[in-house]
Regions:
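Short acidic, hydrophobic short linear motifs in intrinsically disordered regions
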Residues: 4-17, 105-130, 307-308, 317-345, ...
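Eukaryote-specific detector of the first structured module of a protein
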Residues: 1-47, 63-65, 537-540, 544-550, ...
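Hydrophobic residues on short alpha-helical segments
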Residues: 1-2, 95-102, 304-311, 406-413
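Residues in the recognition helix of alpha-helical DNA-binding motifs
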Residues: 27, 140, 307, 354, ...
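Long low-complexity, intrinsically disordered regions
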Residues: 445, 489-562
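A short, conserved structural fragment
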Residues: 32-45, 138, 142-158, 250, ...
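Helix-turn-helix DNA-binding helix
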Residues: 24, 28, 134-137, 348-351, ...
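Short, amphipathic alpha-helical interaction segments positioned at domain boundaries
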Residues: 52-100, 158-243, 249-256, 260-295, ...
Length: 562
């Protein structure tokens, strides 16, 4: 209903669904808990704000609005294995367990997270977490927060992500009429409301409880743990969590004074009630950088990829959004210092020469910005790199779906912008009849556009030009829709195979339970062999489907998130 009808209040959802208040409320609790629905209060005076609700005591309150978070839904359904593997490779298995627990439960307080992760590590003594395991969990949690892999769950005072990402809108022109000035004032007021909410959230988004930060620093200073070159960020004290203490009215019960009395996990200073969740934006940023490095390695070699990887890693903390078109400008000395810290043996002259070669390359993957106090500065054109990858992905899809001749026509139209049918047939060296069939197949699936330019008012075919062209933006959206459709089919097929495997296991258990005689043992043995073969076949099918789903998710991320 939220996908079809858009943002709705609780009362509107109850009326649309035909269900009672209690079932709708429980469903929203689960969806908000897992981040698939965002609950917030629209700005006063906003055009889409619902009317205030009057309570029985006569007071008037602003209603909450519920919206679907489609990107986070796709991340939770498709990208969970990739995220867990990334976390395990960079920070170890304990970090993987923490993120896995957060994905299972959506959002948790520190005390709840500790109670859920400790049993997975096999370290519980009478229902309590040992001190050594608690220290390890503290360290890993701080490392995750400093790496921005986890974040505080947004409150109801926080606008939705699609509003937070673009808080500043252009103001009205100076020569506007009185009416337009009034509209502009209202729009500015709404923008300021959303911007203030986003600013409050960004200030505390990765803020750790002061007690936890101090405890981990003490453990590192005492030499009880190996920090593995992790940089602990000193957070300024005195920052509050907003008027609502970091909790939304739709969240589950937060921490209390009695929760996790050991250490600072259960401290009653207000921080124990803050809930945490996985920050998919940071993982998407890492995957985006890895995709850029992969393309540079394929086109220009390992040394160029090493330099680009160092530039992206050094400027990552300065990026304000995931889809930045250019990286932060870095001088040759800055890039060289980053490479030295990562253990590279490249000299300063080699780094400078590699950057010059990248700047002179026709692909323009790196651009010269200018002179800085540290020398000549360069930046990585991430937008251009990813556009090139998207084009190659679309071309691969056209070739697989329509054949090599269709790919030849698609590339020709992309290079020449617009051509007539006869020109396409001549340049592509394809018969006219076959060219027409391929063009109309591509047109039917929205991979090309046909534009009619008439020289007369009667639009007679003999006096009309029919121009074929490729709109890369439209094709990219169409291809992404096809990928989402394929991903949905793979998920449904995977669920079907898993249910089939459960039925095979149930049948095998029933056959074992019915074994009651020596004569029947042979029959049961044959049945078990059949069930074993069916189960192995199901395992191979599930492995193939998971591999295909992983590849499909990589392509979806390229078009939807990068």
């Amino acid at each position: 209903m939220l996908l079809e009808a858009g943002p709705q209040t609780l009362g509107e959802l109850v009326a649309l669904s035909g269900l009672g208040l209690a079932p709708v409320r429980r469903a929203l609790l689960v969806l908000v808990q897992h981040g698939m629905v965002h609950c917030h209060q629209p700005a006063p005076g906003a055009k889409d704000a619902p009317p205030p609700r009057r309570r029985k005591d006569g007071s008037v309150t602003q209603q909450y609005v519920y919206e679907v978070c489609l990107p986070r839904m796709l991340h939770a359904l498709l990208r969970t294995p990739t995220v867990l593997v990334k976390a395990r490779d960079e920070m170890g298995e304990v970090t993987e367990k923490i993120l896995e627990t957060l994905m299972e439960h959506g959002r948790l307080t520190l005390g709840q997270l500790r109670a859920c992760v400790a049993p997975k590590l096999g370290a519980t003594e009478g229902g309590e977490v040992p001190e050594k395991v608690g220290e390890q969990l503290d360290i890993e949690f701080v490392a995750l927060a400093n790496a921005h892999f986890i974040e505080q769950a947004p409150t109801t005072a926080t606008p939705p992500p699609w509003v937070r990402n673009k808080p500043n809108l252009p103001a009205a022109a100076s020569g506007a009429t009185a009416k337009s000035k009034g509209v502009s004032t209202a729009v500015d007021s709404v923008n300021q409301y959303y911007y203030a909410g986003a600013s409050r959230y960004n200030q505390v988004r990765f803020q750790l409880p002061p007690g936890l930060e101090a405890r981990v620093r003490g453990l590192v200073a005492a030499g009880k743990v190996n920090p593995q070159k992790r940089k602990w960020v000193t957070l300024s004290e005195g920052q509050d969590y907003g008027d609502d203490g970091g909790l939304s009215p739709m969240s589950i019960d937060g921490g209390t004074e009695d929760e996790g009395r050991n250490g600072v996990w259960g401290s009653a200073d207000g921080h124990a009630a803050v809930q945490w969740r996985v920050n998919f934006d940071e993982f998407n940023r890492r995957f985006r950088h890895a995709a850029c490095v992969k393309l540079v390695r394929q086109k220009l070699g390992a040394r160029a990829a090493t330099v680009v990887e160092a530039m992206l890693a050094s400027g990552r903390r300065f990026e304000t959004k995931v889809d930045e078109s250019r990286s932060v400008p870095l001088s040759v000395q800055d890039v060289y210092s980053t490479l030295r810290e990562s253990g590279s043996s490249m000299s300063l002259e080699e780094v400078g020469a590699e950057l010059e070669d990248l700047n002179d390359d026709p692909l323009e993957l790196i651009s010269l910005v200018g002179d800085t106090p540290g020398g000549v500065a360069f930046c990585v054109n991430m937008g251009r790199i990813l556009d090139y990858r998207k084009l190659k992905e679309v071309e691969a899809g056209v070739r697989d779906r329509f054949g090599p001749l269709a790919l030849r026509i698609f590339r020709l139209l992309f290079l020449k912008r617009q051509l007539e049918q006869k020109q396409i047939a001549d340049m592509a060296m394809i018969p006219t009849k076959e060219t027409r069939e391929i063009l109309y197949r591509l047109l039917r699936h929205e991979y090309v556009i046909l534009q009619e330019i008439s020289r007369s008012t009667d639009h007679a075919p003999t006096r009309t030009f029919y121009l074929w062209r490729v709109d890369v933006g439209t094709v990219a959206k169409r291809y992404m829709n096809d990928l989402l459709f394929v991903g949905g089919n793979l998920v449904h097929r995977l669920q079907h195979e898993m249910k089939k495997g459960e039925r095979v296991i149930d049948a095998a258990q029933a056959a074992l339970a019915s074994q009651d005689s020596a004569s029947g043992s042979t029959r049961v043995g044959l049945l078990m062999e059949t069930h074993k073969e069916q189960f192995n076949q199901m395992k191979r099918m599930v492995a193939s489907l998971e591999t295909l789903l992983h590849r499909c998710d990589d392509a979806i991320a390229l078009f939807a998130d990068y």
